[in-house]
Amino acid sequence: MPKLKNHSGAKKRFAKTATGKYKRRKAGRKHLLTPQSGSRKREMRQTGIIKPESAEGKLLKKYLPMD
């Protein structure tokens, strides 16, 4: 059986919390921010949370087996 390894791209983008959820950064914060409203930019400042039972969470379990 081959060694289990974390997906290097997922490792850089997602972090597992103590409760088993995954943290991620919100998209759209790099450029072209002027036409966006302040409330939208403020919302993107917060971290996104991915629940482990969601479809994305199940994929992340496969991508990050060592976490």
UniProtKB/Swiss-Prot annotation:
A GO MF label: structural constituent of ribosome
A Gene Ontology BP annotation from the UniProt entry: translation
Region span, Disordered: 1-54
GO cellular component, one term: large ribosomal subunit
Gene3D superfamilies documented for this protein: 4.10.410.60
KW Ribosomal protein (keyword) present: yes
Skewed-composition ranges (Basic residues): 1-32
Superkingdom of this protein's organism: Bacteria
Keywords per UniProt: Ribonucleoprotein, Ribosomal protein
Keyword match Ribonucleoprotein: yes
Pfam families tied to this protein: Ribosomal_L35p
HAMAP family: Ribosomal_bL35
UniProt similarity note: Belongs to the bacterial ribosomal protein bL35 family.
Protein name per the record: Large ribosomal subunit protein bL35
Organism: Elusimicrobium minutum (strain Pei191)
Lineage: Bacteria, Pseudomonadati, Elusimicrobiota, Elusimicrobia, Elusimicrobiales
Gene designation: rpmI
